[in-house]
């Protein structure tokens, strides 16, 4: 277990049995990221990695994520068997050949499956890393349910707000960065001088939209009473 460039999460590569995944592919053709749930109770990314490495089951996913780490079982340059219809009809043009599958480990409480907050946060890290790596927009991050109607990940089909929350987290940092960049473009803070009652003071001079401003805190430092 270690770290991989750009991914702030413990990472392991555990190659799945060759019978569980398909042909090689050009990663330039990757257009979607499909999120799934394992449908197990208390499983781990390591356990799933070992399972798909040691058993022939004819299915797979590229990544498995749990509370504290992720395991990659199929190389991005290979086709994983993770989002076929199993008799259902396709609802979009996402296929195994043009997507990456990310499985989230689950727990079961009183017969109901849940994806823990920590697992969700780690899945966000993995998905955002893949989005950046392959230039995939948030609109192309979908559930298995969106591919063919399968109830997967079931907790996020049952509760659409959970899915909406996940999607919002994928673009949150990008939006914050954009706002910050916009602010930096329109607002510049430099050190200046002001003379008040014949005395010179150092001030923070703010140039914004072509106008000069002084931070109110500067007046307080000069000994004036300042109210907000």
Residue map of PLM features:
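N-terminal catalytic cores of peptidoglycan-degrading enzymes
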Residues: 1-95
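Basic/polar, cationic surfaces and motifs that engage anionic cell-wall
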Residues: 1-15, 22-27, 97, 105-184
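Residue-level signal for tight coil/turn positions that link beta-strands
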Residues: 67-68, 138, 209
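A sequence-level detector of short linear motifs
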Residues: 72-73, 149, 202, 214
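Sec/Tat-exported extracytoplasmic proteins
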Residues: 37-41, 74, 130-134, 174, ...
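A mature extracytoplasmic/lumenal domain signature
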Residues: 39, 67, 77, 106, ...
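Primary recognition of N-terminal secretory signal peptides and signal-anchoring hydrophobic helices
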Residues: 175-228
């Amino acid at each position: 277990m270690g770290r991989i460039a750009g991914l702030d999460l413990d990472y392991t590569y555990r190659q799945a049995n060759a019978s569980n995944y398909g042909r090689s592919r050009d990663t330039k053709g990757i257009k979607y990221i499909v999120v799934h749930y394992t449908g197990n109770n208390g499983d781990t990314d390591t356990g799933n990695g070992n399972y798909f490495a040691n058993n022939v089951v004819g299915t797979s996913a590229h990544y498995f994520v749990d509370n504290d780490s992720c395991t990659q079982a199929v190389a991005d340059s290979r086709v994983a068997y993770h989002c076929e219809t199993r008799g259902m009809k396709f609802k979009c043009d996402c296929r195994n050949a043009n997507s990456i599958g990310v499985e989230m480990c689950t727990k079961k409480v009183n017969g109901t499956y849940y994806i823990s907050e920590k697992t969700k946060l780690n899945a966000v890290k993995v998905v955002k890393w893949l989005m950046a790596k392959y230039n995939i927009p948030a609109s192309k991050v979908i559930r298995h349910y969106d591919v063919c109607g399968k109830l997967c990940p079931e907790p996020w089909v049952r509760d659409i707000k959970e899915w909406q929350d996940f999607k919002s987290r994928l673009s949150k940092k990008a939006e914050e960065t954009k706002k910050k960049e916009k602010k930096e473009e329109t607002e510049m803070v430099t050190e200046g001088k002001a003379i008040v009652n014949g005395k010179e003071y150092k001030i923070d001079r703010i140039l914004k939209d072509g106008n000069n401003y002084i931070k109110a805190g500067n007046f307080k430092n000069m000994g004036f009473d300042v109210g907000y």
